[in-house]
Regions:
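Short capping loops/turns at secondary-structure boundaries
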Residues: 107-111, 127-130, 145-149, 172-176
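Helix-turn-helix
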Residues: 31
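Proteins enriched for Cys/Gly/acidic motifs involved in redox and nucleic-acid/cofactor modification
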Residues: 22-26, 115, 129-157
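Zn2+-dependent cytidine deaminase-like catalytic core
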Residues: 34-133, 220, 240, 245, ...
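Generic structural signal for helix capping and beta-alpha/helix-loop junctions
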Residues: 108-109, 135, 301, 323
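A short, flexible N-terminal coil/short beta segment enriched in small residues
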Residues: 13-17, 37-44, 133-146, 235-242
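Enzymes that bind and transform nitrogen-containing heteroaromatic metabolites
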Residues: 2-27, 83, 151-152, 158-369
Length: 369
């Protein structure tokens, strides 16, 4: 059946798109497959912002075979001139006869215009094939392009009884090496990494990506620091390993803000007496930071959850029992007064990492019910 074949080819396009996870920001992940007479003759995916799009890679590989072919693409072909030309026009010029699209592009510069160009040129267009999977593929891009805010993922490592440290503050290491390595792989695919000032004062972290099999990329480091207390001799202020942003309140001493800037750090003011996380996310989104991995403590985590800013959670759970009424948990603060207010996850996935378990899920939104 044609419908089954279309789904099979679209699944391949989505699989190709995933090859560039973490590398295309602020662009979406896109894969394309060219099919002629029932067989794949060319494939492509968007590799990095500013480089050719998936359709162009696939068309270049197909050459003359593109004429009369069907092209499967995981996102509506673009219709505007940016750093590259419009893919919809490239498809028309290549002479393809049919284009199958997983989902329309919500980017206002596209938003149906690519489909319109194709149809006006006489190309048959089919939409909505594996649309749900295509949405999941581009969860980061969709959040950023529709709200202007980064996609926020909260990552935590805890014991089986929900502790992120002992009552005495010891936390290295609760989870095993495989879990920690998976955490570095997450750093590699997010634009930014966010912590609170207390994490910096206690641990002096580098917040860099350390991978064995390939050279990872370091995310932009973001610190919530209402009073600009970040030590000038900390790793974040001295190692030069990555762009570092310190988010302060308007009440932060001007001398401290100036000292941070003199050390080469970027200072963002968001909020009056403490950092307003919603205002901060709007600023970061405007800076084209499309995704943020949060590795903060319980108070930072709760502030983001309470503000409705968290989109995904990664929880690494070790089979250890720590106990202690004063031992810290992944979510502190005032907490939610009623169960109905609790943040619920959906689309849960689990992975076994030796004896540890990684649980991840999307935060359930009321409008999804």
């Amino acid at each position: 059946m044609q419908e089954d074949f279309d789904e099979q080819m679209m699944r391949r396009a989505i699989e190709l798109a995933r090859n560039a996870t973490g590398r295309t920001s602020p662009n979406p992940l896109v894969g394309a497959v060219v099919v002629k007479e029932g067989r794949i003759v060319a494939e492509g995916w968007h590799r990095q912002a500013g480089t050719p799009h998936a359709e162009v890679h696939a068309l270049n590989m197909a050459g003359e075979l593109a004429r009369g072919a069907t092209v499967y693409v995981s996102l509506e072909p673009c219709a505007h001139y940016g750093r590259t030309g419009p893919c919809a026009k490239a498809l028309v010029e290549a002479g393809v006869s049919r284009v199958v699209i997983a989902m329309t592009d919500p980017n206002p510069k596209v938003a149906g215009k690519g489909i319109q160009i194709l149809r006006e040129a006489g190309v048959e267009v089919v939409t909505g094939v594996l649309e749900k999977e295509a949405h999941e593929l581009n969860e980061v891009f969709l959040k950023w392009i529709t709200t202007g805010k980064p996609f926020v993922a909260l990552k935590t490592a805890m014991s089986l009884d929900g502790k992120i440290a002992t009552a005495g503050g010891e936390s290295q290491w609760i989870t095993n090496e495989k879990s920690r390595y998976q955490g570095h792989r997450l750093r590699d695919i997010y634009d930014g990494i966010l912590v609170g000032i207390n994490t910096v004062l206690q641990d002096n972290p580098g917040l860099t990506t350390r991978l064995r099999e390939y050279q990872g990329q370091n995310p932009v480091r973001i610190v919530l620091d209402s009073q600009a207390r970040l030590p000038l001799d900390s790793k974040l202020a001295t190692d030069g390993a990555a762009r570092t942003i310190v988010a302060v309140s308007a009440q932060a001493p001007a001398s401290r803000r100036a000292a941070l800037e003199a050390a080469g750090l970027e200072v963002l003011v968001a909020g009056t007496d403490k950092v307003d996380v919603v205002e901060l996310m709007n600023q970061l989104g405007a800076m084209r930071i499309t995704s943020i991995l949060v590795e903060g403590g319980g108070r930072v985590n709760f502030s983001l959850l309470e503000a409705g800013l968290v989109d995904r959670v990664y929880a690494f759970v070790a089979p250890k029992l720590i106990g202690g009424s004063q031992a810290l948990t992944p979510v502190e603060g005032e907490g939610f007064a009623q169960l109905a207010q609790a943040v619920e996850l959906e689309n849960i996935q689990t992975s076994l990492l030796d004896n540890d378990v990684m649980i991840t899920g999307r935060v359930r939104r009321p409008e999804c019910e």
